[in-house]
Each structure stands twice: as C-alpha cells, then as structure tokens.
C-alpha cells in the first residue's frame, strides 16, 4: 500500500472518530434532560446562557441583568448546558434544563419561598402559578395558565419519565440552528389575534400550525437582533407566499417615529400597485365577500385600484388608552370620486353606506363600524372616529420627512411602550422607554427584528 493511501485512510479514520466523538459528547451531555420536553410543544427555544454571559461580560445585557441576578451559580442549575424554553399545545410556558447539584437547587428554591414535596422519585416545587420538578440530573419548570389548570403535576412527572422517542418533535429542527438564542415554532404559537387573521388569509384546509418559523437572536447592550425564516410543507401555502412576493413591492423609504404625531404607537409600511393588490385580495374568500358587500354601496374596487405607491397603516393610542387605526395610501388617480353621486347615502344602522361631509371628506359605515376617509395631496386617508385629530396633521408630517431607505417589502415600527406590558415586570423596567422595535420582511419568507 502506498504512503499516500495510508495517509488518506488515516485522515478518513480521524475524521470519522472526530464526528463520532462529537456525536457522543452531544448525546451524553444533552439526552438526559432533552427527553423531558413534552411531545405537544408548538414553540421551542434554546438558550446558551454561558455564551450570552461571555459575549457581554464587560457590559450588562438584558439577559445577564434580569436572569443571572435571579439565578446565579448558587441555584444548582447547570448553565454550561443550554436551557430549553417552550410553549405547549395548551399555550403554557415552560423551561427544561440540566441540574448541577440537586441539593443546592432545593435549598435555593426553599429560600425563595417555594413549597417542596416528593412526587414519585422527583422533587416537586410550587410557588403561585410556577411549578418545578427536578431530580439529580434535570429540571422541568412550567407556568400554570390559571388555578383551574388541573393535572399539571401528573403532566410534569409523566414528561420527566418519558423516553426520548416520545419527546418534542421540534428538537431536531432547532439542532440545525446556530446562535446564542434560537427558536423554532409553529405559527399557531403566535398571539390569538394574529392566528385569527392567518385563518382568514390561509388557503382552504391549511392552518397556522402548517407554518414553521425558525429564528436566531443575538443580544447586544440594551438591544437585540433576530433573523428569521418562514417555511411550510404545504404546497398551497407556498403558492400564497409566492403571490405575496409578486404583489408587494420594496418599500424603498419609510417615515420614522420622529417625523409624525407622538400619539402613534406603531406603523406598518407597504408599497403596492392597487390593481395587483385587488387581485390578491379577491383570492382570499372572506375578503372577496367583504368587497362584494362594500361594492353594493361604494366603489371599493375602483378605490383600491387607484392606489399606487407607499401605504402606511398607523395605530394611534389616544389619551383614553384605546387603539385606533389610520391608513394612508398614495393615489395614482381619484377617478373613483367621479361616481360619488351614485353611492348609496342611506346610513341605516347596521348597513353599509356613506355620508358626504365635503367634496373630499366622507364617513363610511361598514360592518357596524364607522370610518372617516378623505383625499389630501393625492393621498387617501382612512381613519377610525377617534383618530380625526391625529389624521389632520399626519399627511403633512409624512411629506416633510425624507424617510429612511430600505428594500424590504414590509417594515413595521412599534414603540417599546406599546408592547412592554406583554412582558414580565422586571423586563418592562429594564429597557429604555424611547426604544423602537423594527420588524422587516425582505420577502414573504425572510424577516428580521431589531431594537433601535
């Protein structure tokens, strides 16, 4: 055998042994607690605590400030192994991780007012709605939805005893992602308001659970950036995503919060050609029916077809605390106003109709809701009743702004104050209140979220 062949064979054997050792290390360090993950998980995130701390050891981050101050190395939790946070099918939130010292963990929980009992071969700790079960190797924590959420202890013990084959199906997907903080979720893990909207838009016989979202997040000092991807095994959903790409054009420029009314809590920026968007809207059965109803009173099809250019959807938070919508769209023409005298002016409660307030200002009643719309400077503005004062100066502010350049098909800005109530109190107070969350879609399948 030649010397070269011996070298090649030796190299192949070395590579094989390296992969085998890595696989052995992965299994030996992880399988003893990953098997605890419930089989009905709809969202799963992996958190490399040690990497997050190393990355920010010279400056405090959201994670190190909130998490490590509460759970130091005296907790008995093994932070050199990743933590896995999840949402199950009942929308309960939980965490799974490795235990470095069960006695230390038990002492830590006792000092923090947890009630600890034995359940089978495990320690069961409870405090209000938080339940935590652990042994010498692993722990499993979960938040009860309410006091009526019964059977939680049996559910947790069953998960602690299950085999790896019965555990979370999303685990293999998250293993393909790199990052300090990674996430895999089915779209039915999103808030109810979003899944309800998706049910309307998605093709027949498809559901939010048929969409998978994967993302990786990196934390920086007082902010973060998340890169994400949307995918589906359903052919009809992929066709819908392709139609979205063909319908929505790059935004090019968008107005920042600095240039508009301070009562605005969030903005969605789009760029559409009205005729193409109308065809897309008609492909959605519920939207098509709504358009048919509107067209019995006003020329909704012609109004939509007249749009060409930037479209912005504003959510204004009034002093009363209620949220209200404003839509502003650039018009190619105002031809739909030619037939204004033919629009039905019968405003009987519960019907669809309109009231002419001036030559270019109107009130529409549709689906038991009132809206005002006006034409200003070749733009269409549609607003809910409480937003009239906000709408008055909005168009001028938008036109006076140079805008920020982008090539994304959708840009959404959200003020931190508008979402911080969704988080637990320690995180609410940590980040500065003048922050803005920016969500951008480069196409229908790729997005990023960052804090500015």
What are these regions, as identified by a protein language model?
Residues 1-5, 9:
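Positively charged n-region of N-terminal signal peptides that target proteins for export
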Residues 8-20, 159-279, 407-452:
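Leucine-rich, highly hydrophobic segment in Treponema pallidum outer-membrane-associated proteins
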Residues 16-35:
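Membrane-interface motif at the C-terminal end of an N-terminal transmembrane signal
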Residues 32-33, 235-259, 371-374, 382-400:
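Interface amphipathic segments
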Residues 33-43:
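Membrane-proximal juxtamembrane linkers immediately C-terminal to transmembrane helices
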Residues 42-66:
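Short extracytoplasmic
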Residues 45, 75-177, 305-410:
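Single conserved position on a long alpha-helix in the C-terminal lobe of the eukaryotic protein kinase
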Residues 252-310, 317-321, 332-337:
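Extended non-catalytic domains of envelope/secretory-pathway proteins
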């Amino acid at each position: 055998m030649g010397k070269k062949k011996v070298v090649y064979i030796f190299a192949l054997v070395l590579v094989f042994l390296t992969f085998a050792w890595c696989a052995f290390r992965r299994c030996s360090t992880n399988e003893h607690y990953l098997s605890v993950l419930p089989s009905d998980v709809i969202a799963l995130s992996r958190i490399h605590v040690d990497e997050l701390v190393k990355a920010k050891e010279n400056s405090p981050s959201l994670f190190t400030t909130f998490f490590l101050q509460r759970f130091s190395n005296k907790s008995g939790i093994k932070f050199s192994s990743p933590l896995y946070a999840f949402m199950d099918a009942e929308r309960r939130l939980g965490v799974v991780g490795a235990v470095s010292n069960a006695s230390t963990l038990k002492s830590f929980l006792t000092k923090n007012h947890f009630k600890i009992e034995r359940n089978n071969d495990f320690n069961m700790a409870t405090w209000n709605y938080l339940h935590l079960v652990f042994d010498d190797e692993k722990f499993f924590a979960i938040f009860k939805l309410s006091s009526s959420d019964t059977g939680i202890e049996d559910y947790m013990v069953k998960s602690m005893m299950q085999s790896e084959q019965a555990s979370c199906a999303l685990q293999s997907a998250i293993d393909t992602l790199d990052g300090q903080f990674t996430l895999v979720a089915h779209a039915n893990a999103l808030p109810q308001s979003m899944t309800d909207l998706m049910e309307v838009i998605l093709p027949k016989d498809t559901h939010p659970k048929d969409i998978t979202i994967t993302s990786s997040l990196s934390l920086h000092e007082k902010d973060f950036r998340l890169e994400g991807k949307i995918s589906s095994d359903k052919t009809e959903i992929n066709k819908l995503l392709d139609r979205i790409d063909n319908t929505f054009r790059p935004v090019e420029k968008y107005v920042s919060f600095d240039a508009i009314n301070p009562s605005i809590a969030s903005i969605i920026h789009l760029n559409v050609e009205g005729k193409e968007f109308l065809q897309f809207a008609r492909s959605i059965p519920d939207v098509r029916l709504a358009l048919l109803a509107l067209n019995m009173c006003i020329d909704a099809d012609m109004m939509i077809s007249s749009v060409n250019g930037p479209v912005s959807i504003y959510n204004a938070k009034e002093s009363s605390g209620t949220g209200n919508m404003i839509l502003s769209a650039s018009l190619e023409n105002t031809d739909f106003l030619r037939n204004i005298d033919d629009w039905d002016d019968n405003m009987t409660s519960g019907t669809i109709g309109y009231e002419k307030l001036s030559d270019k200002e109107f009130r529409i009643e549709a689906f038991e809701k009132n809206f005002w719309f006006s034409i200003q400077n070749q733009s269409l503005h549609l607003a809910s009743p409480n937003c009239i004062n906000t709408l008055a100066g909005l168009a001028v502010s938008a036109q006076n702004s140079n805008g920020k350049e982008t090539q994304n098909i959708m840009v959404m800005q959200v003020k931190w104050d508008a979402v911080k109530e969704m988080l637990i109190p320690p995180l609410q107070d940590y980040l500065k209140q003048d922050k803005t969350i920016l969500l951008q879609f480069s196409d229908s399948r790729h997005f990023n979220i960052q804090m500015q």
